[in-house]
Regions:
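Bacterial N-terminal signal peptides
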Residues: 7-14
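Short, compositionally biased P/S/T/A/G/V-rich stretches that sit at domain boundaries
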Residues: 21-43
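Positively charged n-region of N-terminal signal peptides that target proteins for export
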Residues: 1-4
Length: 137
């Protein structure tokens, strides 16, 4: 019984040691799509524009409190706080501090999730994300 307790305690400590750090957020901080609007019908090629309130938009690289950059997730959920945002064809990184992007999507219904993350791409979580739906014609 003592061995089981000890093993459980050690495993718990190990999990705590590798849990991702959750970046701190200023009160009232948020991101938003300025274009397109939720539910909009768009052409296969369109421009998405993003904004951030309560934090400063900066290039990726240095991790500084109150700063970060945008990521756009196509047809996927927001990245949990503290986790690194993936980088692939559906997880677009805007590490140069961009606040808009030209997108080309196939016809149909798509979700776009804007996700803000720190200079090392660690997600600020759901508070710093917004998901909209677009109908591509």
């Amino acid at each position: 019984m003592k061995a089981l307790f000890l093993a459980t305690a050690l495993l718990s400590l190990n999990l705590l040691a590798v849990a991702p750090a959750v970046p701190a957020l200023p009160a009232g901080a948020k991101v938003a799509f300025t274009s397109p609007k939720d539910g909009a019908t768009v052409a296969t090629k369109f421009t998405a524009k993003f904004s951030v309130t309560g934090m400063k938009l900066e290039k990726a690289g240095a991790v500084k409190a109150g700063t970060g950059h945008h990521h756009l997730i196509i047809d996927g959920p927001a990245t949990p706080a503290g986790q690194i945002v993936e980088k692939d064809l559906t997880h677009l990184h805007f590490g140069n501090g961009q606040s808009e992007a030209e997108l080309t999507l196939t016809p149909g219904k798509h979700t776009l999730t804007l996700q803000f993350a720190d200079g090392a791409h660690a997600s600020y979580g759901p508070q710093m994300s917004q998901t909209i739906t677009v109908n591509v014609k």
